[in-house]
């Protein structure tokens, strides 16, 4: 029991406790809304097709797959536009205040979604517009949210705090889709948006109770120089750059989550409730592996483990793409979550140890363009390929591409292959 309490040492800090509880609630609501939006677009476009002319021939494309892919595009454009600005704000302003205002915007967006859906005025274009606005708010929020953790706990408890924050996402991606699936199947999808609105209000109150006020340690101004400094540091630190490329390639080509409505509805034939259940597989795999890792001592040869975990992610995605069995699909999707968690923990350790605190917000913002831009572009890529060749081919080919690109990163960035554990990076920084 004492050892378990020690692993949750970060929760002893009052401010971090409020942050953690607020984020647990709002992240669950956000995952519910993410599920609902994907299913909403799928239902609005289901069974529709459109034709485009290219190279002298007509190509018939499925609207539902293309529409789901377009969600990725409308999410990634605001991330590219605002993520770097979010990093500068996180290093120059009170991170707590930035988080409050971005959540106010997110709550208003969810409220509008609720009203339009319940009143019957919702359409695909409205969903796209509100999704883009929500992505912009997230882009401005994430650097502050990730960077403030180091301000709320002592350095020796930072790793524990990061692990607990990872646990939030894993639990939310299990509970959120499952709850949303039940609500959509039994009641009205608009209620999911309404619940998300309420969760943002809870998060705003929790963040408002945090006593910490940001104190700028350096003259980090909101300007081009501060922006360029963060970009230069990230791109010149090769081991950080290599880990970001690994993340980007994996999520760009092997992001099967956006195709889940098609897999569940058309291939496996399990409907909205089955879609919600299938969506829990990846976070359950992530949660199980995360718990196992928390019970082990520090791993050795982490660079090779990182590369292997991304390769496993790609192989599991490929098998998921050609599966017609719900059990096999669930198992493979869970395996992608396991591989991603191992990769995420090692990548996060490398970046935190290699980045000075005064640059952390900007490093996070650059990483965000890879971490969040990859999946959203991946949704677009998968949607385009699936609309022409079908969802199974899109998912399978993406998994194979991930394995091949992982091999390229292993060759191009030998510092990743040679990385053993945190002591390697500590020695390099001394």
Where are the regions that the model predicts?
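Alpha-helical transmembrane-bundle signature of multi-pass membrane transport and export proteins
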Residues: 1-430
């Amino acid at each position: 029991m004492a050892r378990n309490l020690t692993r949750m040492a970060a929760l002893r800090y009052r401010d971090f406790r409020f942050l953690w509880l607020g984020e647990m609630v709002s992240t669950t609501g956000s995952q519910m809304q993410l599920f609902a939006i994907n299913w909403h677009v799928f239902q609005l476009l289901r069974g529709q097709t459109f034709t485009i002319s290219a190279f002298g021939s007509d190509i018939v494309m499925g609207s539902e797959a293309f529409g789901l892919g377009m969600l990725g595009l409308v999410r990634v454009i605001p991330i590219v536009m605002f993520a770097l600005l979010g990093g500068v704000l996180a290093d120059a302003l009170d991170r707590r205040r930035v988080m409050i205002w971005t959540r106010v915007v997110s709550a208003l967006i969810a409220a509008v979604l609720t009203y339009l859906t319940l009143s019957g005025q919702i359409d695909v274009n409205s969903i796209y517009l509100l999704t883009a606005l929500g992505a912009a708010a997230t882009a401005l929020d994430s650097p502050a949210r990730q960077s403030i953790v180091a301000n709320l706990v002592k350095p020796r408890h930072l790793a524990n705090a990061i692990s607990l924050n990872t646990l939030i996402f894993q639990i939310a991606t299990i509970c959120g889709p499952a709850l949303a699936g039940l609500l959509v199947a039994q009641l009205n999808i608009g209620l999911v948006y309404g619940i998300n609105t309420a969760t943002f209000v809870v998060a705003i109150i929790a963040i408002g109770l945090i006593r910490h006020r940001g104190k700028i340690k350096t003259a980090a101004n909101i300007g081009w120089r501060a922006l360029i400094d963060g970009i230069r540091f990230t791109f010149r630190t090769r081991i950080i750059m290599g880990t970001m490329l690994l993340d980007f390639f994996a999520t760009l080509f092997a992001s099967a989550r956006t195709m889940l409505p098609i897999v569940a509805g058309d291939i496996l034939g399990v409907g909205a409730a089955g879609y919600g259940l299938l969506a829990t597989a990846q976070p359950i795999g992530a949660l199980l592996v995360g718990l196992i890792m928390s019970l082990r001592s520090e791993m050795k040869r982490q660079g090779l483990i990182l590369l292997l975990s991304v390769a496993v992610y790609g192989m599991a995605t490929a098998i998921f793409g050609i599966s017609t069995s719900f059990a096999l699909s669930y198992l493979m999707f869970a395996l992608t979550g396991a591989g991603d968690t191992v990769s995420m923990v090692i990548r996060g350790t490398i970046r935190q140890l290699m980045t000075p605190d005064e640059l952390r917000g900007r490093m996070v913002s650059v990483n965000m363009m890879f971490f969040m831009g990859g999946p959203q572009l991946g949704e677009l890529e998968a949607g385009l390929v699936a609309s022409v060749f079908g969802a199974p081919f899109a998912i399978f080919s993406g998994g194979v591409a991930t394995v091949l690109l992982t091999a390229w990163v292993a060759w191009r960035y030998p510092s990743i292959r040679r990385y053993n554990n945190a002591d390697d990076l500590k020695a390099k920084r001394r």
